[in-house]
């Protein structure tokens, strides 16, 4: 068994890397330390590298389509790791989950229609809705900081508001995030059941973004929304990709599961309108290798991420108690409650950049309820995380 060294620091600068090479273009100092965008500072697994090397050495990168080995790897992964027995014809390939969200918005709603999301949430949800001339309706998650201090995440769904919004705003589409980015909730079967029943009552289609489904911390379990009830599967578009799990975002491949044939055809029609047909040749290779032989690497990675999370928690408690960790149940993106610093929104964002020298994701990006928060990516060597936390401590210590 290969032992992977996640402590090793890999220099990503000069690789056209969005995370490290575009600070100035995005209004940040050139020397800012980035822990923002959701990719990892770890090389991929040995199996993926070997498969890509073989494909590169072949030397021809023509038009490609996946065959049986690809689909079997994807379906076996979902059954093995997420207890979901799928069928090949359910799978629609897209270059990414955000691309798929846009296709779903156009396939299942009309301009002017309302689409419901749960802020604070991954900001492309809002952008995709508005950019396609639809209306954003927000079922804001309830946050109780005292719950988080006792070990609970602190976020929960306001189900009364959820159903009221569906009815009053004539919602056609709900975009679910499970696990939820950025707050880190992994929704329970009971919560998903309640959401699904409400959506069925109001004839709402669910697009479930489950791209972080392989990152769940001990004591929690990810449940595919479509598996909770066969009726839910008939109204659900489930979005998955190997990009977050195996650090393959740049290879642009995702797998969208749509059991309902009518919904699948409508979705595929929108994909066809974009002219997208053949997936990235190397993306196919990497995805198949990851799902076929990536579990050992992933198991080691999960253990390392847990160490990083524990390190972060202890550091904040001991050295920066003004910043509260919203205990994540899943994802390697951690939500920090900075409300005790007394600054929010743009002022907080600028403090993080100018005084701490860090590039995090400001909470306001995820919705108004995130103004006092910052999102930090802990998928990096622990030395990088420690450096970032020391910079943050120095800035907070000097905050007047």
Please provide the spans of the model-predicted regions:
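Conserved PLP-binding active-site segment in aminotransferase class I/II-type PLP enzymes
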Residues: 1-19, 28-31
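PLP-dependent class I/II
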Residues: 4, 27-33, 38-54, 85-87, ...
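Short clusters of hydrophobic/aromatic residues that line enzyme substrate/ligand-binding pockets
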Residues: 9, 61-63, 225
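A glycine-/small-polar-enriched, mobile loop at the entrance of the PLP active site in fold-type I
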Residues: 34-39, 53-71
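Short secondary-structure boundary segments
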Residues: 59-68, 74, 157, 288, ...
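Conserved N-terminal alpha-helix of the aminotransferase class I/II PLP-enzyme fold
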Residues: 62-95
């Amino acid at each position: 068994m290969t032992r992977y060294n996640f402590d090793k620091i890999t220099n990503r600068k000069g690789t056209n890397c969005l995370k490290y090479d575009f600070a100035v273009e995005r209004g940040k100092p050139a020397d800012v330390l980035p822990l923002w965008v959701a990719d990892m500072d770890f090389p991929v697994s040995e199996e993926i590298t070997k498969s890509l090397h073989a494909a590169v050495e072949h030397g021809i990168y023509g038009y490609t389509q996946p065959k049986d080995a690809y689909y079997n790897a994807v379906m076996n992964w979902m059954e093995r790791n997420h207890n979901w027995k799928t069928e090949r014809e359910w799978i629609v390939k897209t270059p990414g989950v955000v691309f798929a969200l846009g296709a779903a918005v156009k396939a299942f709603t009309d301009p002017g229609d309302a689409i419901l999301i749960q802020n604070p949430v991954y900001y492309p949800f809002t952008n995709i809705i508005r950019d396609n001339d639809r209306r954003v309706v927000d079922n804001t998650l309830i946050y109780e900081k005292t719950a988080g201090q006792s070990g609970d995440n602190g976020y929960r769904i306001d189900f009364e508001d959820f159903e009221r919004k569906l009815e009053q705003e004539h919602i056609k589409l709900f975009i679910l995030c499970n696990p939820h980015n950025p707050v880190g909730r992994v929704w329970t079967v009971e919560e998903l059941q309640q959401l699904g029943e409400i959506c069925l009552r109001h004839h709402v289609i669910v697009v479930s973004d489950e791209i972080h489904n392989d990152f769940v911390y001990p004591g929690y379990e990810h449940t595919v929304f479509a598996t909770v009830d066969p009726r839910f599967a008939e109204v659900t578009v489930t979005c998955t990709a190997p990009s977050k799990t195996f650090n393959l975002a740049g290879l642009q491949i995702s797998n969208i599961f749509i059991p309902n044939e009518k919904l699948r055809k409508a979705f595929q029609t929108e994909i066809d309108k974009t002219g997208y047909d053949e997936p990235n040749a190397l993306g196919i290779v990497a995805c198949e290798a990851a799902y076929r032989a990536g579990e050992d690497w992933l198991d080691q990675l999960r253990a390392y991420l847990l160490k990083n999370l524990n390190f972060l928690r202890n550091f904040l408690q001991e050295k920066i108690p003004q910043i509260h960790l919203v205990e994540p149940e899943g994802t390697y993106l951690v939500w920090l409650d900075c409300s005790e610093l007394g600054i929010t929104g743009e002022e907080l964002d600028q403090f993080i950049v100018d005084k701490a020298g860090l590039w995090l994701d400001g909470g306001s990006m995820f919705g108004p309820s995130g103004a006092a928060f910052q999102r930090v990516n802990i998928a990096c060597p622990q030395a990088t995380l420690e450096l970032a936390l020391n910079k943050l401590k120095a800035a907070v210590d000097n905050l007047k």
